[in-house]
Curated annotation (Swiss-Prot):
It is found in: Plastid, Chloroplast thylakoid membrane. The gene is ndhI. Belongs to the complex I 23 kDa subunit family. It is an enzyme of class 7 (translocase). One of its GO terms (biological process) is photosynthesis, light reaction. [4Fe-4S] cluster 2 binds at C74, C104, C107, C110. InterPro entries: 4Fe4S_Fe-S-bd (IPR017896), 4Fe4S_Fe_S_CS (IPR017900), NADH_quinone_OxRdtase_chainI (IPR010226), NDHI (IPR004497). This is NAD(P)H-quinone oxidoreductase subunit I, chloroplastic. NDH is composed of at least 16 different subunits, 5 of which are encoded in the nucleus. It comes from Trilisa paniculata. Its cofactor is [4Fe-4S] cluster. It is a peripheral membrane protein. PROSITE patterns: 4FE4S_FER_1 (PS00198), 4FE4S_FER_2 (PS51379). It catalyses: a plastoquinone + NADH + (n+1) H(+)(in) = a plastoquinol + NAD(+) + n H(+)(out); a plastoquinone + NADPH + (n+1) H(+)(in) = a plastoquinol + NADP(+) + n H(+)(out).
Length: 166
């Protein structure tokens, strides 16, 4: 008789424990129900990037002195700088500057070490193309002013800040 009573008590304890675990899982599910959705409708909604975001590189042709510091600090020697030495004034004249964004790792070393600040990072991150050769930007494409998402009235911008719990 006693083994039957102990088995029944064991069964009751296991039932209570299982109900408690199910209740804990349900409480976690309910706590997540009040949160905002994580997904965004991408073409129509875009996240506002942070101030230090590393997007497409912007290049100012007039400021560049063709010192090639950007090439030396790049971990993959990516920027292609073509220049000609002007013998009468003993200065380099920049002929062509290009970066292949298909290879670029967006480390930002070229921007950080540029002595004339002719390179800067923008908030543009939409660089996808159907042909990888279109990702090779010359000085004209690099000099194009960045498109700001904040100024586009057709796109709903979403601030990407962590929630502060009070």
């Amino acid at each position: 008789m006693f083994p039957m009573v102990t088995e029944f008590m064991n069964y009751g304890q296991q039932t209570v424990r299982a109900a408690r675990y199910i209740g804990q899982g349900f409480m976690i599910t309910l706590s997540h129900a009040n949160r905002l959705p994580v997904t965004i409708q991408y073409p129509y909604e875009k996240l506002i990037t942070s101030e230090r975001f590393r997007g497409r590189i912007h290049f100012e042709f007039d400021k560049c002195i063709a010192c090639e510091v950007c090439v030396r600090v790049c971990p993959i020697d990516l920027p292609v700088v073509d220049w000609k030495l002007e013998t009468d004034i003993r200065k380099k004249r920049l002929l062509n500057y290009s970066i292949d964004f298909g290879i670029c790792i967006f480390c930002g070393n070229c921007v950080e070490y540029c002595p004339t600040n002719c390179l800067s990072m923008t908030e543009e991150y939409e660089l996808s193309t159907y042909d990888r050769h279109e990702l090779n930007y010359n000085q004209i494409a690099l000099g194009r002013l960045p498109i700001s998402i904040i100024d586009d009235y057709t796109i709903r911008t979403i601030l990407n800040l962590p929630e502060i719990k009070t």
